[in-house]
Swiss-Prot record:
PANTHER family on file: AMINO ACID PERMEASE, GENERAL AMINO-ACID PERMEASE GAP1
Entry protein name: Amino-acid permease GAP1
Residues annotated as glycosylated: 8, 183, 370, 448, 462
Disordered: annotated segments: 1-28
Membrane topology type: Multi-pass membrane protein
Family note: Belongs to the amino acid-polyamine-organocation (APC) superfamily. YAT (TC 2.A.3.10) family.
Residues that span the membrane, as ranges: 82-102, 120-142, 150-170, 190-210, 216-236, 263-283, 302-322, 343-363, 402-422, 427-447, 481-501, 510-530
Amino acid sequence: MLHKKETNDTFVQLNRSPSTGEQKSSGIWSSIKDSFKPALPQDKLTGVDDIPDRELTDIERININAANSNLQRKLKTRHLQMIAIGSSIGTGLFVGTGGALSTGGPAAIVLAWAISAISVFMTMQGLGELAVAFPVSGGFNLYASKFLEPGIGFAVGWNYFLQFFVLLPLELVAGAITIKYWNASINSDVFVIIFWFVVLVITMLGVRWYGEAELVFCTIKVIAVIGFIILGIVLICGGGPNHEFIGGKYWREPGPFANSFKGFASSLITAAFSFGGTEMIALTASESSNVRHALPKAIKQVFWRIVIFYLGSIIMIATLVPYNDKRLLGSSSVDVTASPFTIAIVNGGIKGLPSVINAVILISVLSVGNASVYATSRTLNSLAEQGMAPKWTGYIDRAGRPLFAILITNVFGLFALIAADNEKQVVAFNWLLALSGLSSIFTWMSINLSHIRFRRAMKVQNRSLTELPFVAQSGVWGSYFGLTLNILYLIAQFYIGLFPVGGKPNAYDFFLAYLGVPVILASWIGYKIWKRDWTLFIRAKDIDLDTGRINVDLDLLQQEIAEEKAQLAEKPFYIRIYRFWC
């Protein structure tokens, strides 16, 4: 049974400082210096009050450490909602869609993004249910250890860490290339350093400033996407400077599909990867000031982001840009000149706006770089708390920053200085990306499986869903559906890796596309050998459903939910529909 706890203000009193005269001036520097000291203990989540006086098992220690994290809850509702909306609106949408259009054609990319959107929505619903009930450090990384078994948590956690660890220098390179849109003679290294310093400052200011920065970045991205959709409708209807009615012109010629089924499979993989980062909302749960109300709203925002921002943009791109446009050929995740957003505006005869779109792409690059440091540092901190990474990497200072994890990630970002200019180093960089290339798919699969096992444990242990502050709208079957689609992604990636579009089968392309599979298997097997633990999964009756749970008075919770339902029942049907999705 869960119990409501009294708030302990002891540490609030300790942090108060004099505010008069010279004391205020010296107090600022003292506060900065003191902020790097070890964190003060935080209030515990439920399930950790009565620790048995015996040697703990690995899974018990993992659950208890995650529930006692010293990360600070400073993210507000506005931060979570914008992070949920904008966490994956980046170069994957603004640039990566160009390559998918060239490979698959307009119908293929619309279908691919629609299928991926459904998959992500189902997965995020299950993740939301877990994250609201268990707002612990590490999020889905911890859920894999808690509801599946620690070996899977180890493999998924380290692969997720590596994915975003390598992403920071990639985004810095993308930022430098974006600048060259205006002046090709500019030295890339100068802007790599500038962008790196901006990311360093934001991430070192703490989680609250990360939230504020993302609020600004995401607002700009959202405005840009909505503006592009409106502009796209105008251009399609012939309202542009060229006064040419486009309609379904490019769907008829050159046609709806390119490269038949193989092109569609390739587009499906690109679509899935473009949603990478959506799951990051779960990492914010342990630093949210109001998990009970803020996180469900943020999770529901996924629906609107998918429908409006992604599918809306994809339909505009598919209608305004022919898939055989030569500017799309050879497009990559960092080549902004191949952005279908830019091409669509240029084709429409509009001057000036391409520079605006590229400025938005530049902001997206900074946003994703900023988010990559956040994801990497929190994941590494969680792994350290679980005993799966060196203990010192989990150091949290008094400002609530996983300090060493942040510094490690930012220092590695300087690898972009090498990757920006040296072709041989770029090859090595691509192989580093390949190591974790399928990390998002594995992470989503672990979320699906964790939710399925959580629901199974609830049933076996005779626990009611009324205990949960938030219940997935898609239920447990949504997680089964998401798991099935994620398995299909792996099959499609294997197929495309073995038989690449427009090329002959070769070992280089195959391993570049599928290296993530043997890497994650090796990680899992390595953990088993290291721990000498050959348990394949935790039995449902043995899954700990209490440690790390949010502090909730169950009677009060059920009363609040009943009152909310009663009030909603009195509203018009359109309000009820809105509240269901928002």
